[in-house]
Design a protein with these regions (language model features):
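N-terminal intrinsically disordered, cationic/polar leader segments
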Residues: 1-38, 45-50, 87-119
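Conserved interaction-surface patches within small, structured recognition/assembly domains
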Residues: 44-61, 70-74
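Residue-level signal for well-ordered alpha-helical scaffold segments within enzymatic catalytic domains
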Residues: 10, 68-71
Length: 119
């Protein structure tokens, strides 16, 4: 398990893996509220009912955190994602590295992921 600085570096590295969303996807409807920086998410189920999400943001830690979370749920069955809760992501240990405002944003991101799966 990574500790402190190594976890932050991991989040920055994950942020660098993010494929930018087109500007047309960076709408207020796709924006995650409650975060210190801007973060957008789009997603839905593919033809096999597997969830696929894409994120983008304007801050490395936020974008990296979102990438870690979406990597976990991408490819999962829609019904599995729909049953998740915010608490299911606690073992990741990311929350402890984030400011309170970023923790709120993480909760909003996970809530949106679940809402998209329930749509």
């Amino acid at each position: 398990m990574l500790e402190g600085h190594d976890r932050l570096q991991y989040l920055v590295d994950k942020a660098r893996e993010v494929e930018p969303l087109p500007d047309t996807a960076k709408t207020e409807d796709n924006r995650i509220r409650g975060c210190a920086s801007k973060l957008w998410i789009i997603g839905g189920a593919d033809t096999e009912n597997k969830m696929q999400y894409q994120v983008d943001g304007d801050a490395f830690i936020t974008k990296g955190t979102a990438k870690v979370v979406t990597d976990i749920v991408n490819g999962a069955d829609k019904s599995e994602v729909a049953r998740l809760t915010v608490e299911d992501f606690t073992p990741l240990g990311i929350k402890e590295l984030l400011t309170l405002q970023r923790q709120n944003g993480l909760g909003e991101l996970i809530t949106r992921i679940i809402r998209i799966a329930n749509a």
